[in-house]
Amino acid sequence: KKVLLLITLLLTIFLSSCQKNELILVTTTSLDNSGFLEYILPYFEEEYDVKVKVIARGTGAALALGELGEADVLFTHDYDSEMIFMNAGFGEKRSNVMFNHFLVVGPEALNLESVELTFDYIYDNELEFYSRGDASGTHLKELSQWELFGYDVSTFGDWYQETGQGMGTTLSMASLDDHYTLTDIATFCAMKDTLEVEIAFEDVNELLNQYGVMKVNPDLHNRDDLNADLFYDWILRDDVQVLISEYKMCDLQMFYPNAE
C-alpha cells in the first residue's frame, strides 16, 4: 500500500508539473491551416519553456470550448462573437492582435467592382457556392455579407451548400467541385499550389479579417493561469508584433499587427 501511495503521489506531482509547463491555446482552423502557428509559437515556447497545446476549431466551436473552461487562451476572428463571450464573463481580457483579409475564390475571376456586386452576381446566376457552415469566423463573415446585401441564405437553392468543414478542406472541395467560397488569404496562400481556383474578388477594406486574443476566465478551470497571462502579454509585445509582420507567403505579408 505504501508503494502504491508513493506512486500515486509521484504521478500527481508529475502531472501538476506538466500542467504548469503547458498552455492550451484554442484557435481557428485558418491560423492552423496557414502555417502561422508553426511559425510563431516556437518563439514563445523557447522564451518561457512552455509547451503550447493547440486545438484548432472554427471560432464558434473555439468559443464553446472556452465557455467550458477547456482553454487557457482563445485566438479567434469574429469580434461580435468575442464580445458576447467577454460580456458573459467567460473571458478575463481581450485585445486585437492582427488583421488580414478574406477573398472570394472560385473557378473564374469575376472582376467586379465590389463585394456586393460579386455576391449579387453569384446569387443572380446561382453560381455553386460552398459555405463553411460551421459557425467559424469565416462562416460568420460570409453570412454577414449576405445579410448586409439583403439576402437570406435559408431561402437559397441547391447551388448553395454547407460543408461543415474547416477552411483547408472547404477550399479543397471548392477546387475539386468548381464552387465559389469565401476564404482567408493566409490559408489560400498556404494551399495555392494545390488548388485550381481563381481569385474572384479581393479587397482589404471590404473584407477585413480581424484577429483577437482572449484570456479565458480562470474561474472556469482549475489550471494555473500564469502561462495564459504570459502568452496574452507576449503576443501583444512590440517585438512579437514585428515577428507577426514578418510572416510571408505568396511573397506577401500575411498579417498586419494592430495590438492595442
Predicted regions and their residues:
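Bacterial N-terminal signal peptides that target proteins for export
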Residues: 1-4
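Bacterial N-terminal signal peptides
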Residues: 6-14
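Exported/periplasmic ABC-transporter solute-binding proteins
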Residues: 18-47, 60, 64, 79, ...
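Extracytoplasmic
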Residues: 20, 49, 68-69, 80, ...
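Non-catalytic beta-sheet/beta-sandwich ligand-binding modules that flank or precede catalytic cores
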Residues: 52
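Short beta-strand-centered segments that line the small-molecule binding cleft or hinge
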Residues: 63-78, 82-96
